[in-house]
Structure formats: C-alpha cells, structure tokens
C-alpha cells in the first residue's frame, strides 16, 4: 500500500473512531466469510465491522483522541465501530463469540475508557439504555402511587379518628 492510500485509510478510520459511541476489538482468525456476514447482520445498520492494518488503526485511534489501544491492536484484529446503543452491540458480540469460538474479544473503548478483554465482556452484562429507562419510569410510577396512597391515607385516618371520638362521646353521654 502506497503512502497516499495509507493516509486515506487513516483519515477514514479516524473519522470512524470519532463518530463511534464505542469500539470493540476482536480477533477474527478462523471465522468464515458467511460467519462474518452473519455477525455484521446481527450487529445491525448502525455498526460497522472492519479489518484494518493495526499500524494504521493505532495512528487513527490516536488522531481521534483514543489512547491505550496499542496493546490490544496486535495480531489479526477486526474493529467494530458502534453508533448508538453500545451495550446491545456488546451483547451481540459476546453471544456470537460463545457460539463461534474463533471470534475472540480483545478489548473495547467506550465513553472515553479503554477496556481489556474482561472489561469488554463485562460491558455486555450491563443493562441497555431502554432497560434502564423502563426501570426508572417504573420506579417513578411506583413512588407516585405510594405518595398518592399516603396522601389519601392521612385524611381517611383523621376522619376515622374523629368518628371514633364522636362515637365514644355519644356512648359516654
């Protein structure tokens, strides 16, 4: 590859690194073309799965402001650029790696943090944004229902207490 071609690849990769919400690095050695196509399909439209020269990927990552990928970018490495819900992508990659032992998770970078292989696998155990929002909405609804019950219970209790006092006075009289 000649220098202008390398510069073009670095520019493209730099743009991908900058636009991605997360990046997953995997070893793809041993995967067949149909398996890679299947993985790309499962990852969805907002994700790209790319194989690039490690040297060019290192330069692009540094130009994009991502430090710490040098050790991970060794050997045959595929880069998954994720736009959007990177937790869901982590789950897809983890599940695919379980079914296809040839895919090895090497690391990830998300929210300004670089993760080793174990950290990248743990990202898949986190709850996705929609799950967290649903839980949050459920908690708010439950809190509001509890507050409504309490606000309703106070006047009801006061009325019962006054009734009990009135009945007691009527019996005493």
From Swiss-Prot:
Q: What processes in GO biological process is this protein linked to?
A: translation
MF terms (GO), sorted A to Z = large ribosomal subunit rRNA binding; structural constituent of ribosome
> Which Gene3D superfamilies does its entry note?
3.30.70.1730, 6.10.250.290
Q: Which family does it belong to?
A: Belongs to the universal ribosomal protein uL10 family.
What PANTHER family does the annotation carry?
A: 39S RIBOSOMAL PROTEIN L10, MITOCHONDRIAL
Partners and quaternary state?
A: Part of the ribosomal stalk of the 50S ribosomal subunit. The N-terminus interacts with L11 and the large rRNA to form the base of the stalk. The C-terminus forms an elongated spine to which L12 dimers bind in a sequential fashion forming a multimeric L10(L12)X complex.
- This protein's name: Large ribosomal subunit protein uL10
Source species: Bifidobacterium longum (strain NCC 2705)
